[in-house]
């Protein structure tokens, strides 16, 4: 076959392929814009036709789709179609309807499948399977159980303070999110497995850990647009990964560490029993308990335990640590807030009096700081989709068909000026009156709400109350080269990210006057 015959064959073939592609795209556009069951819901036409609209803002513009969604609500109203299949609602009064405690709610595979933890309760799509999976682990995070692990939390705070003492003596600046992530990681792993990761026992702690969870969720977010890309990249080896997407290396290392920990528990259950005798609290640990029940509970497999381990460790570290970071910045950035917090703590706990969780929870100003920190750290800043599997949802006069993913965003709810005036300001007094706190708590959605609410909420509150109180009772801190831009939401990569180039919240420490 000569070149002329090849050209004569390929030329009409390419034109035919091009024509078929054009017809397909036009047909798809007509279908999505006019024939889709969501065609009656307002929104940009391009978003209704293709996920490339979302891809542009979240991947190319690095986590800016949440901000674009806010603009779309200003243009189209409280309900907007943001993709071919998904609706977004920005109305705080609808939150408890969507995130219901009683009505069945499934999760959207678009949100969960790319984290590769399908066996975890967090990633379980169907509500019928989610209920027993959550019920298996929920008792370990109940308020009464968390109250009993105060010695473990206090032990980790003591270790954290030993590290901070070294920084204070040396006059070295501390990047607080590094310290706080190591603290929360050791708490969650010490409680759930008897075998803490030990980051607080490492000199200078483990700086890479504070980035690992962020990298994990960022990769999961990008991977849904590029299925197969990261598994393929992971198979090429460390050198290629370092050149193409180095953040993947820390995620692979984290997963390998989790596999090793779970495999050890699975193959050495007797060691878990021995570890329990030396643990910092007497409460049964979640993962050794699951392993011990595997022989009588078919749903408990090594893969299931691994997926729960990855999810609980990841979810139980960065979000709480980020809230502590936000609290730290705003306390230090406003001398009046620091003065009032110190006065409240010194009044209730004079001298070396022991601070217990139950008493700390009754302190109105400390509570205001914790709640305001949660409000401005958002939990997951990304929208959380829920699906009504059988019944249509009705928002005002708009009917949303069953099996439609519907999302709402804490980053939008927490900045609703009709509920939180001066919403970008850190104002603990919003929460100090107990009746006002009860009213506002309806709109505090950092832990989400409903049947899939964050399972670790009680543990997070305990860590926040105990750690914030202890740190500001003992240390004077001074911000160094840090501004509000270092804690302000600039991009939403599921977790809130500050502006590009931010070095985080850095402080210089010294013992507080009158401190320990």
Curated annotation (Swiss-Prot):
<dbReference type="InterPro" id="IPR001128">
    <property type="entry name" value="Cyt_P450"/>
</dbReference>
<dbReference type="GO" id="GO:0020037">
    <property type="term" value="F:heme binding"/>
</dbReference>
<dbReference type="GO" id="GO:0016020">
    <property type="term" value="C:membrane"/>
</dbReference>
<comment type="function">
    <text>Cytochrome P450 monooxygenase; part of the gene cluster that mediates the biosynthesis of ochratoxin A (OTA), a mycotoxin composed of a chlorinated type I polyketide dihydroisocoumarin moiety linked to L-phenylalanine, and demonstrated to have nephrotoxic, immunotoxic, genotoxic, neurotoxic, and teratogenic properties. OtaC catalyzes the oxidation of 7-methylmellein (7-MM) into 7-carboxymellein.</text>
</comment>
<dbReference type="InterPro" id="IPR036396">
    <property type="entry name" value="Cyt_P450_sf"/>
</dbReference>
<dbReference type="GO" id="GO:1900818">
    <property type="term" value="P:ochratoxin A biosynthetic process"/>
</dbReference>
<keyword id="KW-0479">Metal-binding</keyword>
<dbReference type="InterPro" id="IPR002401">
    <property type="entry name" value="Cyt_P450_E_grp-I"/>
</dbReference>
<comment type="pathway">
    <text>Mycotoxin biosynthesis.</text>
</comment>
<dbReference type="GO" id="GO:0016491">
    <property type="term" value="F:oxidoreductase activity"/>
</dbReference>
<dbReference type="GO" id="GO:0005506">
    <property type="term" value="F:iron ion binding"/>
</dbReference>
<protein>
    <recommendedName>
        <fullName>Cytochrome P450 monooxygenase otaC</fullName>
        <ecNumber>1.14.14.-</ecNumber>
    </recommendedName>
</protein>
<dbReference type="Pfam" id="PF00067">
    <property type="entry name" value="p450"/>
</dbReference>
<comment type="similarity">
    <text>Belongs to the cytochrome P450 family.</text>
</comment>
<keyword id="KW-0503">Monooxygenase</keyword>
<keyword id="KW-0812">Transmembrane</keyword>
<keyword id="KW-0349">Heme</keyword>
<feature type="transmembrane region" description="Helical">
    <location>
        <begin position="13"/>
        <end position="30"/>
    </location>
</feature>
<feature type="binding site" description="axial binding residue">
    <location>
        <position position="454"/>
    </location>
    <ligand>
        <name>heme</name>
    </ligand>
</feature>
<keyword id="KW-0408">Iron</keyword>
<dbReference type="InterPro" id="IPR050121">
    <property type="entry name" value="Cytochrome_P450_monoxygenase"/>
</dbReference>
<keyword id="KW-1133">Transmembrane helix</keyword>
<dbReference type="InterPro" id="IPR017972">
    <property type="entry name" value="Cyt_P450_CS"/>
</dbReference>
<keyword id="KW-0472">Membrane</keyword>
<keyword id="KW-0560">Oxidoreductase</keyword>
<dbReference type="GO" id="GO:0016705">
    <property type="term" value="F:oxidoreductase activity, acting on paired donors, with incorporation or reduction of molecular oxygen"/>
</dbReference>
<dbReference type="GO" id="GO:0004497">
    <property type="term" value="F:monooxygenase activity"/>
</dbReference>
């Amino acid at each position: 076959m000569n070149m002329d015959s090849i050209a004569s064959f390929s030329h009409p073939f390419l034109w035919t392929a091009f024509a078929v592609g054009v017809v397909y795209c036009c047909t798809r556009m007509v279908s999505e814009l006019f024939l889709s069951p969501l065609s009656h819901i307002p929104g940009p036409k391009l978003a209704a036709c293709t996920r490339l609209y979302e891809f542009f803002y979240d991947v190319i513009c690095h986590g800016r789709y949440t901000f674009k969604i806010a603009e779309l609500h200003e243009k189209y109203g409280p309900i907007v179609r943001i993709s071919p299949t998904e609706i977004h609602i920005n109305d705080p009064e609808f939150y408890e309807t969507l995130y219901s405690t009683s009505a069945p709610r499934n999760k959207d595979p678009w949100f969960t499948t790319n984290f590769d933890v399908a066996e975890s309760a967090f990633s379980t799509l169907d509500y019928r399977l989610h209920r027993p999976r959550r019920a298996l682990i929920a008792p370990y995070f109940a308020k009464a159980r968390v109250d009993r692990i105060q010695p473990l939390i206090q032990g980790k705070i003591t270790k954290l303070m030993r590290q901070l003492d070294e920084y204070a003596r040396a006059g070295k600046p501390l990047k607080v999110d590094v310290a706080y992530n190591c603290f929360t990681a050791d708490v969650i792993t010490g409680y759930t497995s008897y075998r803490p990761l030990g980051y607080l026992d490492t000199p200078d702690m483990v700086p890479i850990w504070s980035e690992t969870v962020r990298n994990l969720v960022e990769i999961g977010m990008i991977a849904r647009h590029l299925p197969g890309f990261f598994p393929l990249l992971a198979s090429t080896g460390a050198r290629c990964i370092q050149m193409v997407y180095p953040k993947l290396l820390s995620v692979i290392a984290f997963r390998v560490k989790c596999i090793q920990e779970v495999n050890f528990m699975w193959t050495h259950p007797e060691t878990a029993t021995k570890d329990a005798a030396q643990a910092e609290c007497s409460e049964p640990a979640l993962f050794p308990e699951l392993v011990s029940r595997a022989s009588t509970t078919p749903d408990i497999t090594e893969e299931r335990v691994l997926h729960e381990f990855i999810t609980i460790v990841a979810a139980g570290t960065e979000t709480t640590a980020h809230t502590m970071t936000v609290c730290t910045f705003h306390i230090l950035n406003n001398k009046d807030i620091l003065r009032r917090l110190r006065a409240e703590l010194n009044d209730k706990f004079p001298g070396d009096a022991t601070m217990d969780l139950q008493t700390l929870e009754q302190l109105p100003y400390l509570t205001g700081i914790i709640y305001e920190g949660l409000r401005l750290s958002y939990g997951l800043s990304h929208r959380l989709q829920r699906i009504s599997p059988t019944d249509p949802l009705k928002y005002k006069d708009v009917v949303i068909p069953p099996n439609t993913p519907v999302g709402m965003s804490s980053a939008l709810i927490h900045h609703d000026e009709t509920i939180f005036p001066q919403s970008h300001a850190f104002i603990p007094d919003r929460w100090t009156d107990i009746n006002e706190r009860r009213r506002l708590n309806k709109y505090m959605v950092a832990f989400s709400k409903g049947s899939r609410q964050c399972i670790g909420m009680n543990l997070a509150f305990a860590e926040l109350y105990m750690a914030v109180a202890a740190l500001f009772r003992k240390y004077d801190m001074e911000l160094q080269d840090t501004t509000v831009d270092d804690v302000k939401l600039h991009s939403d990569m599921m977790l809130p990210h500050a502006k590009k180039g931010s070095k985080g919240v850095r402080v210089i420490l010294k013992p507080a006057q009158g401190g320990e």
